[in-house]
Design a protein with these regions (language model features):
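A short acidic, Gly/Pro-enriched loop at the edge of an enzyme's catalytic core
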Residues: 169-182
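S-adenosyl-L-methionine
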Residues: 121-171
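Conserved beta-strand signature within the Rossmann-like core of class I S-adenosyl-L-methionine
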Residues: 212-220
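Acceptor-substrate binding/catalytic loop of class I
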Residues: 193, 223-242, 267
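A short glycine-rich, Lys/Arg-flanked "PGG" loop and its adjoining helix->strand segment in the class I
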Residues: 176, 197-211
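Class I SAM-dependent methyltransferase Rossmann-like catalytic core
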Residues: 18-78, 91
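Core SAM-dependent methyltransferase catalytic element
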Residues: 250, 263-287
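Conserved class I S-adenosyl-L-methionine
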Residues: 76-89, 103-107
Length: 287
């Protein structure tokens, strides 16, 4: 297993035919579009395009509002949180730092880890997250204290872990303790090339979640691509029912969900809507 820890058939008819065609379409898109692991993925440009300004405000306002309500109300609580979210994004952790003493960040590529650490260590060239931090502080009624909030978040990051999602085993438990909450923001459909991989990856992400622990999963619905610079990248297209059923099959009881339809006009991204599922771990599901 490769990881690093930085501390600070036959086609029949109808349904079978449809599934086969759906799989073929996904394979074609996967082969013609770039992938998250490709060298052309620019971590800083990606963040500047989607998450540090008002280009696509739904990407931030939808999850930030939900997470503020969950973490600040105490509906989700504990000491340790595992963040398996997209790229070097941090805004989903701002409210979480009010509730959790330790946050572990899992990422899949060296460039994204490097860029996340640039922010963590205040290095030159790091992404400026002041816009998101001010937005998060507005929810708390103290917009002017965003710099204090940023320092609070930095101190809460207990580790940054690299994991190759093509490995069968998740992170060594000696490096990552059992956690009270797993937060997954936009990541599953980006790193999973098939629905089977989506299911396996969700099981792996949540294997270190304590029984009774909580999963907060954000996913794009019926999305096929996103653009970074001059490149179009693949994303696995899944519908709401598939996401819900996968969460249940993985051993979770869904407690609440939120859905918002697309409300913007842009060629950068083609999602139909965004879904958030809050679920509680009921049992272990073999990988």
């Amino acid at each position: 297993m490769r990881f690093k820890l930085f501390i600070l058939t036959h086609i029949s008819v109808t349904a079978d035919t449809y599934i086969h065609k759906e799989s073929q379409i996904a394979k074609m898109a996967c082969s013609t579009h770039k992938h998250y692991h490709d060298d052309e993925f620019d971590p800083k440009l990606f963040l500047e395009t989607y998450f540090t300004c008002e280009n696509i405000p739904e990407n931030m306002s939808f999850p930030m509002g939900i997470l503020h309500e969950l973490f600040c109300s105490g509906k989700v609580k504990g000491d340790t949180l595992l963040d398996v979210s997209l790229a070097a994004v941090i805004y989903q952790l701002i409210s979480a730092s009010n509730q959790f003493k330790k946050i572990y960040k899992v990422e899949f590529t060296d460039p994204n880890i490097t860029h996340f650490k640039e922010w963590l260590e205040k290095k030159e060239g790091a992404t400026d997250w002041s816009f998101a931090l001010q937005k998060a502080c507005e929810f708390e009624g103290n917009r002017d204290k965003w710099q204090e909030k940023e320092e609070q978040l930095r101190k809460t990051i207990a580790g940054v872990i690299k994991w190759d999602n093509f490995e069968n085993i998740f992170v060594n438990p000696q490096l990552l303790p059992e956690v009270d909450c797993v937060l997954c923001l936009w990541q599953l459909t980006v790193v999973s090339k098939t629905k089977e991989e989506f299911q396996r990856n969700l099981k792996k992400f949540t294997c270190c979640l304590k029984p009774g622990g909580q999963l907060i999963l954000f996913s794009a619905v019926n999305m096929t691509y996103y653009v970074v610079g001059k490149h179009k990248f693949f994303i696995l297209s899944v519908d709401r029912d598939f996401i819900r059923q996968t969460v249940i099959k993985t051993g979770f009881a869904i407690e609440k969900e939120h859905y918002v339809s697309r409300n913007i006009n842009t060629d950068l991204i083609d999602y139909e809507g965004m879904l958030c599922i809050m679920a509680r771990k009921q049992c272990e599901c073999p990988i």
